[in-house]
């Protein structure tokens, strides 16, 4: 279901690329609206559909077509789940630098199409940087191929990038070729806590500007800490840093981070070993679907895109707005990447519905910082009153 709506003409479940092309062609000829569906973890993103005829279930297209460990490349069908692919790659001590939410359910195609970001982007780049080739199905059933299975520099347009974050509006992703990354010989995380909000952000930017190459970095409040399993004090801010490298380089980065933390007024520094860090990053990645505490899953999720230098001031302003509205909330940020995730909790729909003006005020704050704000989760009743995609900023005359 998408915003409570079921496909009026049911599901189509192709088992290979040619069958998927036939389904799309038939829908095109019949003027039927179809929606590509993978694991269904991101179907709530976007405006309600005016028409919904067919759900094109791609989850049966879940094979690894080719895998060349020596070349660090692989080609897979879009219906394979993230965890299934990562398990295959782990046998050769490699991984795909894409860590979207709910990897046991989310498919490769859906993760790319919805641009479901995780925390590995700090060092390893955006998920579009891992894609080297793609096969897509256009809305008229025509198959299109771009790129290939070789990592090399070529001239021309990288058309696959258009489909990452397009939510299937430009075509259905059928197959994807990736470049892979070796797993570091030693990995671990460090949790640094601060008594002041500004100190946590200044420290994060110092890490960003320094000689450390973390795999991931996240900054969050005490509410966020308790939800992912870190027992922090109320009113404290935590910075969680994931690092990975060879033994000596790992120890050197730990030393640099400890020095930076001390010079920025940290209250505590904890080194978390690899076997203990995995559940923390998993909980952080799946923060929006975590229902294990008294707050439950957030009713509203907003994602702001800013420059790294604007994150601190923008988050401070958003916190002021939400404190004034007296609703429970938590904010997770990636200062080095310029991303803010705003989670608002509320039990009653009527209570959340009253936040329309608050959400518009938050968006104005983000826009003043030259950023954009997308609401990835909203109650259905609010989607007609709140600009989900920040289209007013993209089209100032409208």
Regions found by a protein language model. Give the residues of each.
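Short, conserved charged micro-motifs
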Residues: 19-22, 83-84, 197-202, 248-255, ...
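Short glycine-biased active-site loop of nucleotidyltransferases that positions the nucleotide triphosphate
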Residues: 44-50, 229-232
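C-terminal substrate-binding/cap subdomain adjacent to the FAD-binding core in PCMH-type
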Residues: 113, 132-298
